[in-house]
From Swiss-Prot:
GO cellular component entries: extracellular region
Reported impact of residue 163 to V: In strain: 200RIB/A1, 201RIB/A1, 203RIB/A1, 233RIB/A1, 238RIB/AST, 332RIB/A1, 358RIB/A1, 394RIB/A1, 417RIB/A1 and 441RIB/A1
Location relative to the cell: Secreted
Top-rank lineage group of the source organism: Eukaryota
Function in brief: Controls the pigmentation pattern of the adult cuticle and larval mouth parts.
InterPro entries assigned to the protein according to its UniProt record, in alphabetical order: 6-blade_b-propeller_TolB-like, Royal_jelly/protein_yellow
Family membership: Belongs to the major royal jelly protein family.
Organism the protein comes from: Drosophila subobscura (Fruit fly)
Effect of substituting residue 155 to H: In strain: 201RIB/A1
Carbohydrate attachment residues: 151, 222
Signal peptide interval: 1-28
UniProt keywords, alphabetically: Developmental protein, Glycoprotein, Secreted, Signal
A Pfam family matched in the record: MRJP
Protein name in UniProt: Protein yellow
Length: 568
């Protein structure tokens, strides 16, 4: 993540930090179960004496460490810690899950301490962000070679992909990105790995967030190339405003970031979905294009633009299962969302699988392992970057749950007739002359997109907030709070829950707060399914005012109260 003080944020933090809404048990969803948590990170030093020396010398500063990436393989859970500040002893680490079933375990450097030496370019990893384990038992780690963040960034080493054999814990390849694949603004934090017909038929794709490009790397050729001449890699100028944990900030320059890959399609290729961070929109391209070095300059029309996900829909991490379910973080909403790739990419086809205004503040990374278990890491990143975390509180959490449990009774669960496409209508993909269309025909459904109104956030974290207990039984145990037998705690299928701060909401005549972003999108022509008053159920009791649902509500922007809010 690239971040810096955006003039005026820091002076206001004493008022803004405050932050997330206090939630009662009836407001929190608990499909994801907490596995590990930390107030601050700790590392497994070889001895207590060496740890004390590192603390005394400043080589280890516990409050400077922030986890950003997670990946699971076998009995190990990998966690990455970028060197954004001084005192980070290791950037690529893991938890031995046999020794630490839960709790706040020490992070063990992977594969060892020497391989985590900052600045030892050829032999070590300086800074790692997101990582990926492939189906061949290899761990792919992109070393950015950077120390610091924003204006403090230095580049002691070049960008390099490191691949480890997890059976032997040895590095089997290191490949430096050539100068032609980067530019002075390059910042790469995300990686997607594409395995084709064999383990040698492997590609990795890197999203250049600030240099606005997409880089392909071929394992077989040991060669890379860059796609850079595409406007889809750039941020949306209307989507650079963020609200996380009550903090309003701007990341308006953040381009292509989150990526996911579909299962292999009938033509032998996958589809890569991606989205800029400062955007609510998703884009797609076939890996047939990305795997072809000759297409870097003439592939503009092979990229496809999809609809917006809906309001408050910034995302940094996404992953797709082998049966086509995409999960992604919704950082403005303290939530994890879903979309089934067999459905149209429209707001009404998106759902919320879990939301927690305390535990899921900035769910930084999401992964699905080979057993279809989902892993989510949350880290309160904006608070860490723009202010100071409260290290007497739990700041970092890793959650897990079976994928089937997460999507059950959501719009993404096609096994449930209530949420499947009861009357599917095949719609051939449309493409202008010379354009390519990606994927199979789409279909429409009668499901509705149901954003809901949010209550005012409180002004403290609140020590009495409910906490998730670690529960080892994750397969639909009736005793799990908020699981299969407590679905009333979950958002309605397809609904998107707003968690924006008070200062960014619009207040209607009933005194209920409505996300301003939703009004803004409607005002600027972004349409949703709006039939029926069920869309804004809290407005139904006053038919004379706004009881006609969202259409009536949106029409209210012509009234005096709406204009007053806009002028104020």
């Amino acid at each position: 993540m690239h971040a810096q003080d955006k003039g005026g944020i820091l002076p206001a933090l004493s008022l803004l930090l405050i932050a997330v809404a206090m939630v009662s048990p009836s407001q929190a969803a608990y499909k994801l179960q907490e596995r590990y948590s930390w107030n601050q990170l700790d590392f497994a030093f070889p001895s207590a004496r060496l740890k004390e020396q590192a603390l005394a010398s400043g080589d280890y500063i516990p409050t400077n460490a922030l986890p950003v990436g997670v990946e699971h393989f076998g009995n190990r859970l990998f966690v990455t810690v970028p060197r954004w500040r001084d005192g980070i002893p290791a950037t690529l680490t893991y938890i031995n899950m046999d020794h630490s079933v839960t709790g706040s375990p020490e992070l063990i450097p992977y594969p060892d301490w020497r391989a985590n030496t900052a600045g030892d370019c050829a032999n070590s990893i300086t800074t790692a962000y997101r990582i990926k384990v492939d189906e061949c038992g290899r761990l792919w780690v992109l070393d950015t070679g950077t120390v610091g963040i924003g204006n403090t960034t230095t580049n002691p080493c070049p960008y390099a992909i490191n691949i480890f054999d997890l059976a032997t814990d040895t590095r089997i390849r290191r490949y430096e990105l050539p100068a032609a694949d980067t530019n002075p603004n390059t910042f790469i934090a995300n990686i997607a790995v594409d395995i084709g017909k064999s383990c040698d038929d492997a590609f990795a794709y890197f999203a250049d967030e600030l240099g606005y490009g997409l880089i392909s790397y071929s394992w077989e050729l040991n060669k890379s190339w860059r796609f850079s001449a595409h406007s889809y890699f750039f941020p949306d100028p209307l989507r650079g405003d963020f609200n996380v944990a009550g903090i309003n900030f701007q990341w308006g320059e953040e381009g292509i970031f989150g990526m996911s890959l579909t299962p292999i399609r009938s033509d032998g290729y996958r589809t890569l979905y991606f989205s800029p961070l400062a955007s609510h929109r998703q884009f797609a391209v076939s890996t047939r294009i990305l795997r072809d070095e000759t297409r870097t300059e003439d592939s503009y029309h092979d990229f496809v633009a999809l609809d917006e996900r809906g309001p408050n829909a910034h995302t940094t991490s996404r992953v797709m299962s082998d049966d086509g379910v995409e999960l992604f973080n919704l950082i403005d909403q303290n939530a994890v969302g879903c979309w089934h790739s067999s459905m149209p990419y429209s707001p009404q086809s998106h759902g919320i699988v879990d939301r927690d205004d305390v535990g899921l503040v900035f769910p930084a990374d999401i992964k699905i392992d080979e057993n279809k278990n989902v892993w989510v890491l949350s880290d309160r990143m904006p608070v860490f970057l723009l202010s100071d975390l409260d290290y007497s509180d739990t700041n970092f959490r890793i959650y897990t749950a079976p994928l089937a449990t997460l999507i059950e009774n959501t719009v993404c669960d096609l096994r449930n007739n209530a949420y499947g496409p009861p009357n599917t209508v095949s719609i051939p993909k449309q493409a202008a002359p010379g354009h390519s269309a990606v994927g199979p025909p789409l279909y429409t459904t009668t499901n509705q997109y149901r954003p809901v109104l949010s209550q005012k956030p409180q002004t403290s974290w609140g020590p009495s907030l409910p906490s998730r207990n670690y529960l080892p039984a994750l397969n639909g145990n009736p005793g799990i709070p908020g699981s299969r037998n407590n679905l009333n705690n979950l958002g309605a299928p397809g609904q998107v829950v707003s968690s924006v701060s008070v200062s960014t909401n619009t207040v209607g005549p009933s005194g209920i707060e409505v996300p301003k972003a939703y009004v803004f999108n409607q005002h600027n022509g972004l349409n949703y399914e709006t039939s029926g008053p069920h869309l804004f159920p809290t407005l139904q009791p006053a038919p004379s005012q706004l009881g006609g649902g969202l259409k009536t509500y949106v029409n209210a922007r012509q009234s005096g109260w709406w204009h007053h809010q806009q002028q104020g």
